[in-house]
């Protein structure tokens, strides 16, 4: 195995574990899925990150998706500098909130009204409460391997960190909450029809990642997503597209524009904060007007819509154009095709997926359509190759259940270097 000096990161991690559970504030950062200690990052610029040992990496994690303009984008940083000089938070309305709401509405017209929050978890949790209050029903439908944050109702059969650690749900989630969460395999059209035939009049909503991003990148099929739209309409349930990850990532106008399906509600996050803590949920006006203070379904948040997160979102989205997504898609296509070609040269079983700026690779040559397919992939090979990639200056997600991303700052040269790093990793792993 190639050598990488991470002495300072190892010391920092040992110290962190004295004061924080597992030494981190989000479990996937701990590198447990790849059998080693995490890198501690000093700074980032454009498509690169630099650890505290001085190692430089081409970054495809990008803070788990938000940094579509790369690290420390000059315009975003300049706008944040101006905003923070005025004050970090007021607990009162600001012009930035309305400005970002208008930008989101223009790009994603299905979001007629929006409520800003501080995380993706808060966005999905609040959207579920709104759906239950609006329909006067309790049960919700989610899909195995889809991750919608860590609120209790949505931790059943989830992806992301739960998948990384092999956990089905979490201790502390009451059985009665799990009872009201109905689960179906992702992309299982027959399963969806059967579930709604049996429970349709009890279901408040179905929440789905239209492109799953928390078990690697797995697109929802057109038939699957259209079936969801049809059965929710038939039974008076709401359809929620969780685009916290895929929004402004899979496509400029969201996955809903790719599949030509309009959900009742959409959840957002990540990119719309430009790297600051943020989330949002929105949709049809007649539904959203039930949120307090316009209606009686409660939501509040001390830092919801805070001026720094709003500025981060505005200064990010105002720079992006549909043409940027065409260019990024070309680069991801070249990258994933190059990785697959390198894998084939060494007889490494591999399937690659990408949608827009999101991409992932699976150490399995069989079709990957759901969570069970992902779990059948070669974890040991993933682990070996991960460390080889790091040693060659490429930072990818430290779990086969997570998504990688690209930014506007990644260059053709970065793509070539990354493919070469994968080639070297496959060579080392197959010796």
From Swiss-Prot:
<dbReference type="GO" id="GO:0008483">
    <property type="term" value="F:transaminase activity"/>
</dbReference>
<comment type="pathway">
    <text>Porphyrin-containing compound metabolism; protoporphyrin-IX biosynthesis; 5-aminolevulinate from L-glutamyl-tRNA(Glu): step 2/2.</text>
</comment>
<dbReference type="InterPro" id="IPR005814">
    <property type="entry name" value="Aminotrans_3"/>
</dbReference>
<comment type="similarity">
    <text>Belongs to the class-III pyridoxal-phosphate-dependent aminotransferase family. HemL subfamily.</text>
</comment>
<dbReference type="InterPro" id="IPR015424">
    <property type="entry name" value="PyrdxlP-dep_Trfase"/>
</dbReference>
<dbReference type="GO" id="GO:0005737">
    <property type="term" value="C:cytoplasm"/>
</dbReference>
<dbReference type="GO" id="GO:0006782">
    <property type="term" value="P:protoporphyrinogen IX biosynthetic process"/>
</dbReference>
<dbReference type="InterPro" id="IPR015422">
    <property type="entry name" value="PyrdxlP-dep_Trfase_small"/>
</dbReference>
<feature type="modified residue" description="N6-(pyridoxal phosphate)lysine">
    <location>
        <position position="270"/>
    </location>
</feature>
<protein>
    <recommendedName>
        <fullName>Glutamate-1-semialdehyde 2,1-aminomutase</fullName>
        <ecNumber>5.4.3.8</ecNumber>
    </recommendedName>
</protein>
<dbReference type="GO" id="GO:0042286">
    <property type="term" value="F:glutamate-1-semialdehyde 2,1-aminomutase activity"/>
</dbReference>
<keyword id="KW-0627">Porphyrin biosynthesis</keyword>
<keyword id="KW-0963">Cytoplasm</keyword>
<keyword id="KW-0413">Isomerase</keyword>
<keyword id="KW-0663">Pyridoxal phosphate</keyword>
<dbReference type="GO" id="GO:0030170">
    <property type="term" value="F:pyridoxal phosphate binding"/>
</dbReference>
<comment type="subunit">
    <text>Homodimer.</text>
</comment>
<dbReference type="Pfam" id="PF00202">
    <property type="entry name" value="Aminotran_3"/>
</dbReference>
<dbReference type="InterPro" id="IPR015421">
    <property type="entry name" value="PyrdxlP-dep_Trfase_major"/>
</dbReference>
<dbReference type="InterPro" id="IPR049704">
    <property type="entry name" value="Aminotrans_3_PPA_site"/>
</dbReference>
<dbReference type="InterPro" id="IPR004639">
    <property type="entry name" value="4pyrrol_synth_GluAld_NH2Trfase"/>
</dbReference>
């Amino acid at each position: 195995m190639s050598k990488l000096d991470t002495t300072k990161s190892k010391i920092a991690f040992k110290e962190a574990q004295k004061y924080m559970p597992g030494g981190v504030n989000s479990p996937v950062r701990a590198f447990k899925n790849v059998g080693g200690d995490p890198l501690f990052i000093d700074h980032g610029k454009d498509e690169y990150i630099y650890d505290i040992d001085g190692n430089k990496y081409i970054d495809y994690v990008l803070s788990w998706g938000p940094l579509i303009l790369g690290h420390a984008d000059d315009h975003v940083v300049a706008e944040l500098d101006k905003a923070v000089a005025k004050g970090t938070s007021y607990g009162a309305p600001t012009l930035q909130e309305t400005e970002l709401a208008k930008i989101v509405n223009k790009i994603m017209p299905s979001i007629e009204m929006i409520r800003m929050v501080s995380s993706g978890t808060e966005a999905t949790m609040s959207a579920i409460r709104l759906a239950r209050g609006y329909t006067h029903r309790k049960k919700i439908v989610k899909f195995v391997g889809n991750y919608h944050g860590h609120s209790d109702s949505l931790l059943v059969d989830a992806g992301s960190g739960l998948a990384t650690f092999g956990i089905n749900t979490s201790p502390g989630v009451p059985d009665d909450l799990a009872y009201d969460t109905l689960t179906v395999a992702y992309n299982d059209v027959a399963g969806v029809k059967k579930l709604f035939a049996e429970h349709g009049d009890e279901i408040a909503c179905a929440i789905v990642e239209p492109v799953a991003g928390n078990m690697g990148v797995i697109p929802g099929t057109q038939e699957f997503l259209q079936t969801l739209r049809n059965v929710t309409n038939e039974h008076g349930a709401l359809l929620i597209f969780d685009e916290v990850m895929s929004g402004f990532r899979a496509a400029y106008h969201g996955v809903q524009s790719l599949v030509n399906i309009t959900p009742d509600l959409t959840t957002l996050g990540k990119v719309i904060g430009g790297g600051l803590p943020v989330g949002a949920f929105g949709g049809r006006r007649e539904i959203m007007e039930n949120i307090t203070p316009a209606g009686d379904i409660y939501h509040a948040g001390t830092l919801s819509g805070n001026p720094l997160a709003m500025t981060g979102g505005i200064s990010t989205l105002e720079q992006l154009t549909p043409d940027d997504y065409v260019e990024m898609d070309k680069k991801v296509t070249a990258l994933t095709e190059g990785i697959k070609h390198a894998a084939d040269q060494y007889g490494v079983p591999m399937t690659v997926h990408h949608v827009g700026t999101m991409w992932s690779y699976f150490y399995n040559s069989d079709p990957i359509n759901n969570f069970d397919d992902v779990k059948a992939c070669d974890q040991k090979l993933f682990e070996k190759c991960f460390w080889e990639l790091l040693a060659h200056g490429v930072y990818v997600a430290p779990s086969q259940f997570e998504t990688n991303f690209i930014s506007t700052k990644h260059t053709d040269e970065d793509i070539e270097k990354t493919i070469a790093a994968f080639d070297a990793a496959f060579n080392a792993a197959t010796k």
